[in-house]
Amino acid sequence: MLPDNEIMIREMTMDDLDTVVEIEKECFSVPWSKQGFVDALQKNDAYYIVAVADDRVVGYCGAYGVCDEADINQVAVTEAYRRGGIGEQMVRQLLDGLIKRGYLYTTLEVRKSNAAAIALYEKLGFVSEGIRKNFYEKPTEDAVIMWKR
């Protein structure tokens, strides 16, 4: 695990997108395109952050807001930096930023087989509230719907 002072978490910028897209392709079977991230960053209701270690982006996460609810749609850390607490640091900071933006409730979907992510979200106060059948592709899998209220 890297010490907290060796990780910098900040808002995502357009300059981060080439690295973010590389991480996206590494982590997800149906990755977003660079244009998808450009579009997201241009929306007023979106909030995306990156984790920087060793002078490079090693993870990112983001959410969209509607009224007083936010939906976390991506959390990713490159393989070489996993299991070091970066995901938790990012999600904690994301949640803090969402609260400051007026979002009182936060939801997300996670692959049913992703026990590590589910455990992290539970640690951060999320509760499983349902299943979305066949939500994910490549491979097809159910999503666990989680909420933090």
Regions found by a protein language model. Give the residues of each.
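Non-heme di-metal
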Residues: 49, 55, 76, 124, ...
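Accessory recognition modules or surfaces
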Residues: 88, 120, 141-148
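Positions that flank functional sites
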Residues: 39, 113, 136
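Acyl-donor (CoA/ACP) binding surface of acyl/acetyltransferases
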Residues: 81-84, 133-135, 142, 149
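Acetyl-CoA-dependent GNAT
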Residues: 2-3, 11-80, 91-93, 97, ...
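Conserved glycine-rich acetyl-CoA-binding loop
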Residues: 56, 78-92, 99-101, 105, ...
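Conserved catalytic-core motifs of GNAT/GCN5-like acyltransferases
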Residues: 109, 122, 127-143
